[in-house]
Structure formats: structure tokens, C-alpha cells
Amino acid sequence: MAFESWPAGGVRPVEELDVRSFLMEENSTAERCYRSHSRSSVLQGLPFGGVPTVLAINVVLWLILLLIFSCLRKAAWDYGRLALLMKNDSLTSLFYGEQSEKEKTPSDSSPSDSETKDMGFCSWLTSLYHMKDEEIRSKCGIDAVTYLSFQRHIILLMMVVCLLSLTIILPVNLSGNLLGDNPENFGRTTVVNVPAQNIFLWLHSIFALLYFVITVLCMAHHSSRLEYREDEKVARTLMITSIPREISDPGLITKHLHEAYPSCTVTDIHFCFNVQKLMKLDSERRKAMKGRLYFTTKAQKNGRIMIKTHPCAQIFCCDICGFEKVDAEQYYSELEEKLTDEFNAEKNWISMKRLGIAFVTFRDERMTAVIVKDYSRARCRHKPQQSSITTVVRSHQWDVSYAPAPNDIIWENLSVCGPRWWLRCILLNILLFLLLFFLTTPAIIVNTMDKFNVTRPVESLRNPVITQFFPTLLLWAFSILLPFIVYYSSFFEYHWTRSGENQVTMHKCFLLLVFMVIILPSLGLSSLNLFFRWLFDVRFLDETDVKFQCVFLPDNGAFFVNYVITSSLIGTAMELLRIPALLVYSLRLCFAKSKAECIHVKISQAYEFQFGLEYAWTMCIFSVSMTYSITCPVIVPFGLLYLVLKHMVDRYNIYYAYTPTKLNQRIHAAAISQVVVAPILCMFWLLFFSVLRLGPVQPITLFTFITLLCSIAFSCFGFCMKKLRADRSTSYQMSDQTTEGGFSDAERSTISTTATANLFIASVLLEPELGLTPMPSPAHQSYGTMVNSQSSVRDAEEDEEKDLEETLETELKDDLLMDSPVAFQ
């Protein structure tokens, strides 16, 4: 009887039937997806996807973690400022166990260094706002400023995306009526709520293209601000590898280059040696030397000091354990003498450990450009220029490239080269692939835990803490762990430069994070069985109950919103706490044999800031937010929150917790290239949605597909052009620059030739013999305070001690800085 009430023509009822059938199809799809995940804690139909509950829990835990950090920083202040220990008070802490009273110049002091802004319970929060880029640049180097500038550009980009997504895309999604009017339904905010016939779906595709354009423009602006520096490119020095190891006379290299390239003038040549063992012995003898100096000074004030040399003596300090006591000064003196003898013996043999690598410095960078161009053509079956001794030096086998910055070179890794390096790299990456892909993908771990009924007892309660917060916390935790595995795999690959190590780490981590945080969970492929069936079984999509429509379930978007919330609050707070580093720091202090070694631990605990790892992690969360910025626009504000908090945490950690790092500019350019992946993923997800919802031949689908192809083609073209442009700038850009003071090319060559050439020698080969005597202790001062020497009154004896202290500090300054992973210049 209902058919009698249809209007003539039957047009309206057909539309109503289409909507009803579509809704029934949506409901059946949801039922199938939820049924297939009935034992999974990831997909659950919760009020508003559990986002309010997860947000409240994260805010509370975030505040608790900040309180814990403030307490730890107040109680163990040295740990909160490890990077400053080396610069400000490592010397006097070593010799006197007290803070330095050395007078500071106005340029050395900063708001972050003052007692009121550095010692308070929560003063570190205000110091972040008062800290200027000039302070960070003077202490941490230009790479830190470039990284922070990159983050600010990403924040600005995310602000624009957030504004557009919340003011335009979100109202369009809410205007749909497919999922009802219940305000607790998270799906109303997603693209799933918009009917397939709605013309506003065009806005989603247009805005995806707009986001890509905005991203490209923003990164182009950041790229134009990157500084080119001569000390980074070292355009007048070439690194030549595959030189026969039996060649020890640099005159042969000079003769060949002069004959093959008559217009080129060689000013200096330095061969490389296997200094791995030598650097290890040097580190150990410096440690022993510091122990001797410390206890010699203490013995002059307090008499003979006895220590227990067993590694567990600090933990089991009672006399019942029976650890033998020895004279501290004598113990470290004998240890230093032994290590010094081994060091000198190894140094005498170092000339026999040539590596077939040489750094050749020319008078002008135009000369190096000629040689690099000739050898780059040699890769295309073009023989480089010959000389009368070509067969002797085997120049046709050489690999010639611009030398990296001296501070960028990891000298101890140069010994791993050739087939040995490639074999090591291939085996490590195969092992990494097997470990990460087959065992420890976070989505697979969460699914495996569900199979063992980890959350089954409370699933019946439909508790958002378990069904939403717990899985996202697990995904975040494993996402934190796995990049560190990737980092250590890059570390054991023995890259020759820190830039190369960081860049490889960044690329591998980013690809891994995108795969395991975005792709697998989005596709619902949370188990290996499901993944391989989807990959290889041609009948899988027809027979299985799990459809790809599950990708666009409302709660799947809520899962990523909750994940970004967890990363924004708990994630950034944990980065501030640095729990793994704190545990290592505590363990090293427990196993230190003496007070002197405790001081050594404090100095050497400050590590380099891992730009590759942090770039990858920042871009992962940015990519998650950008990928779902249109299909699930609620995620964008939390992505912006993450970027802001991440920026503040990194400012603090770079200044206070990590030592300066000098890198090649290529890693910053590579990070810019990877940012463009995010809007491309957004287009790909929108195309996926259009194909599933609208069909592959609909105009919106075709438009999205064409824009995706054009965006990928544009990105590839820009990447290739950037590679070519980088080669030209490396070769010729420095010719157009002048140094400070306006020196000409000839003057600059004369002044800096010797200094530049000497940089290309491992510092351990330039170190003088350590023969130092301790000085008396200066006036007592409470530890952890900074005193202005202008306000203190000293008598003649204290002035004399201060002069002696400054003399000793001058002699030992470079020695103590050698304890850090890199001595920044």
C-alpha cells in the first residue's frame, strides 16, 4: 500500500531507496568490520570515538609528568643541564668538585644562564620563551636554528590547514545526514557523513590540492632561508678514496694532479689512517688522567684517599663485601701510565695503517670543480684525465667528491670501507627488515595482545580507557621504540659522516613510521595473516568478511585522533623526561668507581641531538594529521598542538640536554622533500575513498586521480632539479661569496690554506702529550650556582689561584671537549 503514495514518475522514491540502500550497506559494512574486530581493542563503537576520555586522561598524565620533570630537575639539576656542564663548569667540577667562578663576558651570559631563570622549580618554562635564536645559534650551532626554523614553518602550515579544515571542511561534513544527528557520533565529523550525491564533495578534492600547493610554497620559503657556508662544503678540498694503500708519498698524488690538471694547484694533502683503536685508548687515558688530577688535588687538601676499584663498589658500599681498597692517586697514576704507553705504541704504528683515503686541498674552489666534473663524467664511461704515473696511483679507480666538514667526519668509522662496508650494511638492513616487519609492527603487536585476551576481561565494560586509550598508548610506545632500533642499525652501519648517518636514519625511520603508523592501521591490516592474504590471495576480497570500506569507519579516524593526542601530550612530556637516558645516566653513576668517574659520567652523558630521528618523528605526526585533515578534520587541532609542544620541548632539549652537532645541509633539504609526502598521502586517501564510495569513473574520482598524478610528477621533477642545483651550488656558489672582512680569493687562500688543511686530520693525531699538574682549589661556592666575579672580593692569593686556574683551563679545554661525541667548532 505504500507504493500508492509515490508521486508520479517515481523519481523521488528512487532517490529515497538509494539512500536507504546506501545506509543499509553502510550499517552492514560497519557490522562486518566490527565483527571482524570483535577481539580487537582498536575498533569499538564508543561515544565520539572515546576522544574526550582519551584527551582528559592525557591532560592529567601530561601535568603529572611535567610535575615529575620539575622535581627531577630540581633534585638532580646536573641531569637537567648536561649540555651546559661541559661548557660552564666541567673543569672546576673535575678538579675541585665545585662550580666555576670564572668571569663571564656579557656575550657569554644570557637569560637562560641566569640563576633566577635556570634554578627555579618551573623557571625552565619561562626560559623557553625568553630564549632567543641567537643564544641557541651561539651555543648549539646553525643546524639547531635551521631545525627549529623548519618546525616553525610546519607550525605555520598546520595553522593554515587547521583554519581551513575547521571552518570549511568540518561544516561540510557536519551538513550531511547519513549518520544521524546524534552529537556523540564521531562519524558526523568525517567525510563518511556526506552523501555520495552531494556536490560539496568537490571541496574535499579541491582542498587536498590546495594543501599540496600551500605545503610546497611553505617549504620553498624555508628552503630559500637555508644558509650556504664554506666551512660546510669545504669547496677547496676533495676527498679521494680507493687510493692504493702502499702509496705513502703525497708527492705522487700531487704530481699526478698537476700533470692531469695543469691549471690546478695542490696546497696540501693528508692521508687517513685507521684510528679506531687509537681513539679508544685516548679516551681511556684521558679518563684516567682526570682521575689522577682529581685525587691529587684532593690529597693535597684532605690527605691520602682510598677507593674501591670494583665496578660494584658504589652499589655494595659496605665493608662486608670485601672489596679491596687502594690508594686513589696511585691507582689512577698507574692506569694512566699503562694506557699512555699503549697509546704511544699504537700511535707509532699508525703510519702503517693507511686506509687509501686522502684529503687534497687546492688553492681555489674553481679547481676542485674541474676535477669533480671530470670524475663525475667518468661514471658515464668517460676516462678521467691521465698522467705519466696513472698506472702507479691507479687514478682511474679513484672516487672523487667534495670533502665533508671536518667536524662532520666520524674518523673512527673510516676504517670500514669498500665491500666490507656494503656487506655490513646489507646484512644489517635485512635483519632490520625481518625484525620490524615480521615481528614488531605496532599494529601487529596490539592485535597479538588481543589474541592472548589481554583486554578481554574488561571489553564487556566498553571502557574507553581500555578500548581507545590503551591501544593508542601501545602504538605510541612501540612507535617510539622501533625508530631507536632503526637508529642503532644506522649507527652500526659505520657511516663516515654524521650527516650521512642522520640522513639515512631519517629516511628509514620516516618510511617505517608511515608504514606502521598510517598505512597498516588505516587498512585494518593488523595481523601478518591478514596482510599476506590481502597481498597474495586473489580471492581474498571476495571471500573475507573484512572489506576495505573498514578504512573509512568513523572510529578508525577516531583511533588516529587519539593517537595524535597521546603523542602530543604524553609523548612530548616523555621526550622532556628522557627516561631511557635517565636510566642509563643512573646506571653509569652506580657503576662508577670513584667521584672522579662520576664527574666524567656527567660530562660524557650529554649526547648529540639526533636530527635524523627527530625530523622523522615530527614528520610522522605531521603526516598523520595531514593525511586525515580532510577525511577526519578533527585531528588537525591536535596535530597543531603536537607541533607546538614538540617545538618547545626541542628548544629546551637542544639547549640544555644535548651537545652541539654540525651536519651537512643535505639533511635539512631532505627533510623538506619528505614534508611533501604528507599532502600526497592525503590525496591518495581521498582517492581511495572516492573509488570505494563513488566509483572509479566518477568526475570527482578522476579529478582526484589526475591531481594526485600531477602532484607526484611535480614532486619528482622538483626533487631531480634540486639534486642538479645542489651540485652546482657545491661547485660554484662559494666563488661568489666573500669572507668576513672582504678578503679576495687570493688573500683568503693564503690566510686559510693551512688552517683548513689541518682540519682534515683526526684530532687524536694532533693531541700533545698530557703532562699536567693540579692546582689548589679556589674559594668554596655552592654547587649549581652561577656567580658574577665582578661582585666578589678576592685577595691577592685568590687572584693568583685564579690565574693559575685559567692557565690550566686553557691547556685542558680541548681535552675535556674531546669527551663529547663531537667537538663543535
From Swiss-Prot:
One of its GO terms (molecular function) is calcium-activated cation channel activity. This is Osmosensitive cation channel TMEM63C. Coiled coil: none annotated. Belongs to the CSC1 (TC 1.A.17) family. GO terms for cellular component: plasma membrane. Disulfide bonds: none annotated. Pfam families: PHM7_cyt, RSN1_7TM, RSN1_TM. Monomer. The gene is tmem63c. Acts as an osmosensitive cation channel preferentially activated upon hypotonic stress. In contrast to tmem63b, does not show phospholipid scramblase activity. Required for the functional integrity of the kidney glomerular filtration barrier. It is found in: Endoplasmic reticulum membrane; Cell membrane. PANTHER family: CALCIUM PERMEABLE STRESS-GATED CATION CHANNEL 1, PROBABLE MEMBRANE PROTEIN DUF221-RELATED. It is a multi-pass membrane protein. Residues 76-141, 224-418, 494-497, 591-610, 658-664, 720-825 are cytoplasmic. Keywords: Calcium, Cell membrane, Endoplasmic reticulum, Ion channel, Ion transport, Membrane, Transmembrane, Transmembrane helix, Transport. Residues 796-809 have a biased composition (Acidic residues). Disruption phenotype: Morpholino knockdown induced a glomerular filtration barrier defect. GO terms for biological process: glomerular filtration; glomerulus development. It comes from Danio rerio. The keyword Transmembrane applies. Residues 98-117, 777-825 are annotated as: Disordered.
